[in-house]
């Protein structure tokens, strides 16, 4: 995790908890390496911080097959579309919208490059980051129904939360180092 160690060191003091959590959540546990790193890649892509994504990709590529990384990136892209669409349908609350066909291509959900169940777990984690209740419920039902334990789901969402927080903390790092306008004027 050399690339992520550099990211952790770049996090400012206000993000000390995130620095510690970023190391902890990626340690071996109930998730397989493919699940752990796939969730990290997918949620880093969803967080849209290039520096964090590059570091997680570097470390993930050293740990898992290329197909896992491809699926994780595909999950982030597909969920960027689906989370907006299905969150809208849920939020507006009109049955008429829910009755309309989505007519959006989602072939990668059906035919991932690696494991279908792992792809669903990546999609669940991204959906949690993006705040789509409908997608979270749907993907959680699929993965648990497919044999993924609630402990594994819980760990995936913990990774998602910490990766998202790390992206925010990296943005803070640039602001924490710069003096405030009020201090500069005083």
UniProtKB/Swiss-Prot annotation:
Keyword Heme: no
Any one of the GO BP annotations: cell redox homeostasis
Cysteine pairings via disulfide bonds: 132-135
Enzyme class name: oxidoreductase
Gene3D superfamilies membership: AhpD-like
Pfam families documented for this protein: CMD
Catalysed transformations (reactions): N(6)-[(R)-dihydrolipoyl]-L-lysyl-[lipoyl-carrier protein] + a hydroperoxide = N(6)-[(R)-lipoyl]-L-lysyl-[lipoyl-carrier protein] + an alcohol + H2O
Keyword annotations from UniProtKB, A to Z: Antioxidant, Disulfide bond, Oxidoreductase, Peroxidase, Redox-active center
GO molecular function, one term: disulfide oxidoreductase activity
Domain of life of the organism encoding this protein: Bacteria
Parts forming coiled coils: none
Protein family per UniProt: Belongs to the AhpD family.
Name the UniProt record assigns to this protein: Alkyl hydroperoxide reductase AhpD
Top-level taxonomy: Bacteria, Pseudomonadati, Myxococcota, Myxococcia, Myxococcales
Name of the gene encoding the protein in the UniProt record: ahpD
